[in-house]
Every structure is written in C-alpha cells, then in structure tokens.
C-alpha cells in the first residue's frame, strides 16, 4: 500500500462536519466514496488532521489515505477533484512515508474567523461569516486578545463533556483585523493545537468584551480559574475557517 497526503478545501455549509457519521453528509464520506471508485471498488479510509464541525469551512484541511500501488499524484489529484462534489476542492496530493499520520504528526494549525459587523449585514455572506448586531469597541478586543498568546490551560474555553485529558495548548498568534470595505472582523489564531470549540468560544468571549458586557481582563480570569462559565457564548460555526496546517520536518 502507498500512503498519500492531500490538502483540501471545502465549503462547510451543506456538511454535518468532516467526520463520517450515520445519516449525515460529511466531507470524509464524500471523499471516501470517490476513492472507492478510483480504487476498483475496494474500501478506502480517509483520515483528517482536523475534525471540523457542521457549517465550518476549510482552506487547508489535510487528509491521508492508502491505495494499492504507486500513482501519478497529479492525475490522482485531478481525478479526486473532478469526481468529488463541487463544494470540495482537492488542492494538492503527494506521496508520503508509510508512517505519516496527518492527525498525529507534529504540526501547527491556523484558523480564521469572520464576523460581519456591517449595518445592514451582508445577506450573501450569511453562511460564511457570523453576524454580530451589537456595538463594539475594537480597542477592547485588541487589548484582550493578546492575553491568549502563550502556553495556557484552555479548559475555560473548551466545550463541556470532552474526553481530552491535557488541555494545555500554545497559541503563537492571536490577532484581529478590521476589513473596512466589507465591514468584517477577521480573527486569526495559530497554535500547536486547539480544543473542541476553543476558537469559537474565544471569539464569543472577545465579542462580549468588545460590547462592554465583560471586562477587558476577563480572559486572564478564565485562564486562571479554568471555568467555562466565565467565558462568553460559543460563536456560530459558519464564520470559522481551518486556514492552514504546517507540519514539522
């Protein structure tokens, strides 16, 4: 068997997430169906580096899968790209070592989160940016977001009921830009890993701080007390994008 690594992008609106699940349309299953056709009907399992939720998008999701024999990677990419549904794009395919695992190989991830703060909102972007209808002081967000950078226990920003034992992660980039033309906020987070719904919970908290309903020092308190109840609401998934995954050599 030969192992292949692929970078894919997808519009998450019509998917129930990346991971295969009963009676639901998922990115994993769509790609597996195409690979089965390309593999003479033999089953193929696709592994993903990140398990995006329903409605979450990706520019740079990484997957891997095994096929019998060696194939021309550009022909394989083209076949996957043209035979998989139109809301999935196969950006690249390469052959990798048999022990490469896209999820467990050491890597960093970058997420973006788009927030529409326009008045009126942009209805064409309703599936691709989260609308926030309340007033914001962007200087408060810019001040608070810096407290997320560094190595912390992010228990206070993860969803309840998760089975992960170690909630310590390192965030290397946490920033916000204002796109004045589109009236969008663009949040960017890079790090060595993120907990379940961590990015959406961080954004929800930052928006509440910007609206003045939480103090600017709230993030420090959440990190110190590890209490999800101190954080803001979970921002909707439609504004979240898995932008890039970079593997260490």
From Swiss-Prot:
Looking at the Swiss-Prot or TrEMBL record, what is one Pfam family this protein matches? PseudoU_synth_1
Functionally, this protein is described as follows:
Formation of pseudouridine at positions 38, 39 and 40 in the anticodon stem and loop of transfer RNAs.
Which residues participate in substrate binding? Answer: 111
Q: What is this protein called?
A: tRNA pseudouridine synthase A
Q: Which reaction does it catalyse?
A: uridine(38/39/40) in tRNA = pseudouridine(38/39/40) in tRNA
- Residue positions of the active site: 53 (nucleophile)
Q: Which PANTHER family match?
A: PSEUDOURIDYLATE SYNTHASE (PTHR11142), TRNA PSEUDOURIDINE SYNTHASE-LIKE 1 (PTHR11142:SF0)
Q: How does it assemble?
A: Homodimer.
- GO MF entry, a single one: RNA binding
Q: Which domain of life is it from?
A: Bacteria
- What's the family? Belongs to the tRNA pseudouridine synthase TruA family.
The Gene Ontology biological process terms listed for this entry are: tRNA pseudouridine synthesis
Q: Which HAMAP family match?
A: TruA (MF_00171)
* This protein's record includes keyword Magnesium: no
Q: Which gene encodes it?
A: truA
Q: Which UniProt keywords apply?
A: Isomerase, tRNA processing
Q: What class of enzyme is it?
A: isomerase
Assigned EC number: 5.4.99.12
């Amino acid at each position: 068997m030969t192992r292949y690594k692929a970078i894919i992008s997808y519009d998450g609106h019509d998917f129930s997430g990346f991971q295969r699940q009963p009676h639901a349309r998922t990115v994993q299953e769509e790609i597996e169906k195409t690979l089965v056709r390309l593999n003479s009907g033999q089953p193929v399992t696709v592994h993903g580096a990140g398990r995006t939720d329903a409605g979450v998008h990706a520019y740079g999701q990484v997957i891997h899968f095994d096929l019998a024999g060696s194939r021309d990677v550009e022909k394989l990419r083209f076949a996957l790209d043209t035979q998989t549904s139109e809301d999935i794009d196969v950006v690249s395919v390469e052959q990798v070592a048999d022990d490469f695992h896209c999820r467990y190989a050491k890597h960093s991830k970058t997420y973006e989160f788009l927030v529409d703060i326009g008045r009126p909102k942009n209805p064409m972007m309703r599936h691709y940016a989260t609308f926030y209808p309340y007033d914001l002081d962007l200087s408060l967000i810019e001040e608070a977001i810096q407290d997320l950078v560094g190595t912390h226990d992010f228990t206070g920003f993860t969803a309840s009921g998760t089975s992960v034992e170690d909630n310590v992660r390192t965030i290397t980039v946490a920033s916000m830009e204002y796109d004045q033309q589109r009236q969008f906020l663009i949040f960017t987070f890079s790090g060595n890993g993120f907990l379940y719904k961590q990015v959406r919970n961080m954004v929800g908290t930052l928006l509440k701080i910007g609206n003045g309903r939480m103090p600017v020092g709230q993030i420090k308190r959440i990190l110190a007390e590890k209490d999800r109840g101190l954080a803001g609401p979970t921002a909707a998934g439609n504004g979240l994008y898995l932008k890039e995954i970079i593997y260490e050599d």
